[in-house]
Amino acid sequence: MRKSYRIKSEQDFQTVFENGESVANRAFVIYVLPRKQNKHFRVGISVGKKVGHTAVVRNRLKRYIRAVLTENRDRIAPDLDFLVIARPYAHDFDWEKTRENLLHALNLAHVIEEMPNKEEK
């Protein structure tokens, strides 16, 4: 995922966090804010120390999240800024479990409209 698809500044994070709608499942919280001036969606990813006490665990989960978003970028509306915040429940997820739970949360938030079949990969 290119850096232009990422929310980096604290001000942008705060704007989405304070003004966006939130949806959650056990593993992820999604904050969504529609933005008309976007050429493509932007995403911020947060995996705190409560999720994984070591950087290895946190970075692996962030890598999985970015991979799921890259895999599904054609299905994500271009006029959105959204945050993906991992909850401690996700600390030991493998690729498949991360994909399944993140797609469920994105579907609940109407970032992705339909769920893919389990056979699709």
UniProtKB/Swiss-Prot annotation:
Gene3D superfamilies given in the database record: 3.30.230.10
InterPro entries, alphabetized: Ribosomal_Su5_D2-typ_SF, Ribsml_uS5_D2-typ_fold_subgr, RNase_P
Gene behind this protein: rnpA
Gene Ontology CC entries for this record: ribonuclease P complex
Keywords on record: Endonuclease, Hydrolase, Nuclease, RNA-binding, tRNA processing
Biological processes per GO annotation: tRNA 5'-leader removal
EC top class, as a word: hydrolase
Name recorded for this polypeptide: Ribonuclease P protein component
NCBIfam families registered for this protein in UniProt: rnpA
GO MF entries: 3'-tRNA processing endoribonuclease activity; ribonuclease P activity; tRNA binding
Family: Belongs to the RnpA family.
